[in-house]
UniProtKB/Swiss-Prot annotation:
This is Adenine deaminase. It is an enzyme of class 3 (hydrolase). It catalyses: adenine + H2O + H(+) = hypoxanthine + NH4(+). Its EC number is 3.5.4.2. One of its GO terms (biological process) is adenine catabolic process. Keywords: Hydrolase, Manganese. Disulfide bonds: none annotated. It comes from Listeria welshimeri serovar 6b (strain ATCC 35897 / DSM 20650 / CCUG 15529 / CIP 8149 / NCTC 11857 / SLCC 5334 / V8). GO terms for molecular function: adenine deaminase activity. It comes from the Bacteria.
Length: 579
């Protein structure tokens, strides 16, 4: 927060009575308010823009050499934990991509560690040259039909609003509780309103009629549109619509046609969940901008969606524009087609130049670890058995690069009254093992789409309750993979049919995050993918993030929890067998 002296100094710079800290000359400024490209000097004082016009007196003069000057990009909805690195490391990845602000929902770590997890994320982000605003998790757990690590009722959340970086209530996922008028979720919404915060939606699978429930209680955003019709429905209902392009949720190409000259001010961009390797190779919000431009969105409109629209969406009044009184978060672009970045300023300081970070701007941190209690009993093959009385079963139909699944009915192989995986039919066994309270609960189901030839994969990243989830071609391989990630205190492992571990990634922070530099995490993810390709014929998708979302019951159609097979349409556990 600024003080009186800083405001007085900024005013003095704006009218030429004092020197600026920095003046940027010869840039072509993208005005996100008028949609114009303008010329003028940008005077910066104490991390804020003091004015745009004719300025020469400064401690430092920077020549933009005709490059385009745009505001720092804003990711309107992201789960940092999906990158499997800490917030401090996340900043190191995002800033070269021009992202200077994120709005995050730390519900992944909250599902494991409760308030302590949220506080850890806020503390770790301190000192990083990235604004990380937090929306408090609204749905921990996501539903009542599973075990997670902690439950966050309204009373537990309310004190966290005192933190200056907490700005609202995160995606309200438990739609049935909203529709029923559940006192806990409505109290959370009331508390957010009292604190002046926004309330994010999660309208996966909701019809235009269902949206009335959302809007009636004050939910004002949504990021779950998977096609243009859904995006328009949300727009017409009065929502800000976030167009998502992540690792699994790749929806931008299906939704971008909803954007028009008349309505673009109500659209912004988000990544939601994106792995570190995709952030490095594709980018973050800069990638969303490029995709939009490639699909006939005007470049300035796309930049508005990535900046001022996102700031307006979350009521961040001093972010999202290159204008007097705004935070000096500035990106230099070589052109407005490829969005090639040459320089990034955060609070008026150069943090990235020609792709290289100014490492002095990034604090070095070693994160403490939250290690969930290990499963006390050694998992056996018997825990993974799936008894059947007939051979027609509900099967989770995995869709590549899509968070939705299909509710399939398939004839499966049964031997001695138990399900047997079929490599030929690509009908594999999936299991979710509770890891937080030593309940011994194991949900077992059948999944199609992973193409395993042998072996198994297991991970403690399993949205949103983050139990252990595994998929395998045999019980023996699954048993080995599950016990291995348990013994290592959280992480991901790929094993072959002999039980040999082909590659692993340790995630000691809540079983979700590495405490290593992101470069090491990227190398391990590449190793995991190489190992997966040794045991699978399936290509063209990320198997680990895909697997982690097969346990999220608040996205259609069929998912698996530690309690069993969850049907989104009825919002309850159903038998594996078709009656």
């Amino acid at each position: 927060m600024e003080n009186l002296k800083q405001l007085q100094e900024r005013v003095a710079v704006s009218d030429g009575r004092e020197k600026a800290d920095l003046v940027i000359k010869n840039g072509r400024i993208v005005n996100v308010f008028s949609g114009e490209i303008m010329e003028g000097d940008i005077a910066i004082k104490n991390g804020y823009i003091a004015g745009i016009g004719d300025f020469s007196e400064a401690e430092q003069i920077m020549d933009a050499a005709g490059e385009f000057i745009v505001p720092g990009f804003i990711d309107a909805h992201v789960h940092v934990e999906s990158a499997m690195v800490t917030p401090a490391e996340f900043a190191r990845v995002l800033l070269p991509n021009g992202v200077t602000t994120i709005v995050t929902d730390p519900h992944e770590i909250a599902n494991v560690a409760g308030e302590k997890g949220i506080e850890f994320m806020l503390e770790d982000a301190k000192g990083a040259p990235l604004d990380m605003f937090v929306m408090l998790p609204s749905s921990v757990p996501a539903t009542e039909g599973e075990h997670n690590g902690e439950t966050l009722h309204a009373k537990k959340l309310h004190p966290l609003y005192k933190h200056e970086k907490v700005i609202g209530l995160a995606e309200v996922m438990d739609f049935p509780s909203v529709a029923k008028g559940s006192s806990d979720i409505l109290t959370k919404i009331i508390d957010a309103k009292k604190e002046g915060g926004r309330i994010d939606g999660h309208g996966a699978g909701l019809t235009s009629a269902d949206l009335n429930n959302y809007l009636a209680v004050g939910i004002r955003t949504d990021h779950e549109s998977t096609n243009a019709k859904e995006a328009v429905d949300r727009l017409r209902a009065g929502m800000f619509v976030m167009l998502r392009e992540g690792t699994v949720g790749r929806d931008l190409l299906q939704t971008i046609s909803a954007v028009s000259e008349k309505n673009s001010h109500r659209f912004c961009f988000c990544t939601d969940d994106k792995l570190i390797n995709d952030l490095i190779t594709e980018g973050s919000i800069n990638y969303n901008i490029r995709l939009a431009i490639e699909n006939n969105i005007d470049p300035i409109t796309a930049i508005q969606m990535a900046t001022i629209n996102a700031a307006n969406c979350h009521n961040l009044p001093y972010l999202g524009a290159v204008a007097a009184g705004y935070q000096a978060d500035i990106v230099f672009l070589k052109d407005l087609q490829t969005i090639e970045i040459s320089k990034v300023l955060k609070n008026g300081q150069v943090v990235v130049e020609n792709g290289a970070r100014n490492e002095a701007a990034f604090e070095k941190k070693h994160s403490e670890t939250f290690i969930s209690p290990k499963i006390q009993h050694h998992l056996s093959k018997q825990d993974l058995e799936l008894p059947l009385t007939n051979d027609t079963c509900y099967v989770i139909g995995m869709k590549q690069n899509n968070l939705f699944t299909e509710k399939l009915m398939e004839q499966v192989n049964v031997e001695n009254g138990k399900f047997v995986p079929s490599i030929e039919k690509d009908l594999l066994k999936m299991a979710v093992v509770e890891r937080h309270h030593n309940t011994g609960c194991v949900g077992v189901g059948i999944v199609k789409g992973f193409g395993l030839k042998e072996g198994a994969i297991a991970t403690t990243v399993a949205h949103d309750s983050h139990n252990i989830v595994a998929v395998g071609a045999s019980d023996e391989a699954m048993e080995k993979a599950i016990n291995y990630v348990t013994e290592m205190g959280g992480g991901i492992a790929v094993v072959d049919e002999t039980g040999k571990v082909l590659h692993d990634l340790a995630l000691p922070v809540a079983g979700l995050l590495s405490n290593k530099p992101y470069e090491e995490v990227e190398r391990d993810l590449a190793g995991l993918l190489k190992a997966f390709n040794q045991i699978s014929n399936a290509k063209g998708f990320d198997p680990f993030l895909t697997l982690s979302f097969l346990t999220l019951p608040v996205i259609p159609e069929l998912k698996l929890t530690d309690q069993g097979l969850f049907d989104f349409a009825t919002f309850q556990i159903i038998p594996n067998e078709v009656n």
